[in-house]
């Protein structure tokens, strides 16, 4: 579901990702996601517009917008958070990456 954060079932450098695909678009067996990385891994100088900071529990994460990818639904694990309240920030990061706006 769009803007939900899920665990990643497979071995990966990323443990979490946010589903950014519209729920009205059906791509059988796949979803568009943006992985999350610990905020500690990125300098504060890195753009917060392109790589928004999100908080899940007591941890800070950065959305790795430039690593957005289509993944099989079979790798989508447990839902751990809902980022619907950050919808505008997420959309703005995607717009910035693709259209520079």
UniProtKB/Swiss-Prot annotation:
Outcome of mutating residue 99 to L/Q/S/Y: Loss of toxicity
Q: Name one GO molecular function term.
A: DNA topoisomerase type II (double strand cut, ATP-hydrolyzing) inhibitor activity
Any phenotype upon disruption?
Disruption of both ccdA and ccdB has no phenotype, except for increased plasmid loss.
A GO CC annotation recorded here is: toxin-antitoxin complex
Matching entries from Gene3D superfamilies are given as: 2.30.30.110
Q: List the disulfide bonds.
A: none
Q: Which GO terms describe its biological process?
A: negative regulation of DNA-templated DNA replication; negative regulation of DNA-templated transcription; plasmid maintenance
Provide this UniProt record's keywords sorted from A to Z.
Plasmid, Repressor, Toxin-antitoxin system, Transcription, Transcription regulation
Q: Which SUPFAM superfamilies match?
A: Cell growth inhibitor/plasmid maintenance toxic component
Q: Does the keyword DNA-binding apply?
A: no
- State the source organism's domain of life: Bacteria
Question: Which InterPro entries does the protein's record reference?
Answer: CcdB, Plasmid_toxin/cell-grow_inhib
Q: How does it assemble?
A: Homodimer. Forms a complex with GyrA, probably a tetramer GyrA(2)CcdB(2), in which GyrA is inactive. Forms a complex with antitoxin CcdA; there are both high- and low-affinity binding sites for CcdA such that both CcdA-CcdB(2) and CcdA(2)CcdB(2) complexes can form. The CcdA-CcdB(2) trimer is sufficient for rejuvenation, whereas maximal operon repression occurs with CcdA(2)CcdB(2). When the CcdA:CcdB ratio is lower than 1, a CcdA(2)-CcdB(4) complex is formed which is devoid of repression activity. In this case repression is alleviated and both proteins are produced.
Family recorded in the similarity comment: Belongs to the CcdB toxin family.
Q: What is the role of the protein in this entry?
A: Toxic component of a type II toxin-antitoxin (TA) system, functioning in plasmid maintainence. Responsible for the post-segregational killing (PSK) of plasmid-free cells, also referred to as a plasmid addiction system. Half-life of over 2 hours. Cell killing by CcdB is accompanied by filamentation, defects in chromosome and plasmid segregation, defects in cell division, formation of anucleate cells, decreased DNA synthesis and plasmid loss.
Protein name stated in the entry: Toxin CcdB
